[in-house]
């Protein structure tokens, strides 16, 4: 019924677009957002960047590189025998890594812990964006 589309990973300054597919939920949406303090004073300006990103499939074109690089990361981790937590077709990839591998990678790579550190393994998230270069992914893969 409701989902959101992020903007920063495709070059937007900030913000997310909320998509409501169930028209019954639209009835009081503006009032609810305003009531809970989530309405930005000039929030309509955020919509301009999404309007442009959605024109002529630009959002998908910009995001294509990020998704391709994320899939390369996933395939490299799988080839090394690491566990994929979520089989994600997006620019976000989730793995369960041995702590010694995670500790070694964090010296040279940026990623996020996706939960508390376990005794032997920890879940992590790697995220690519429009700015992720092929050579950056090559370097990460070489560290595996």
What are these regions (language model features)?
Residues 1-90:
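Active-site C-terminal subdomain of aminotransferase-like
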Residues 71, 76-144:
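Conserved C-terminal alpha-helix-loop-beta "cap" of PLP-dependent enzymes
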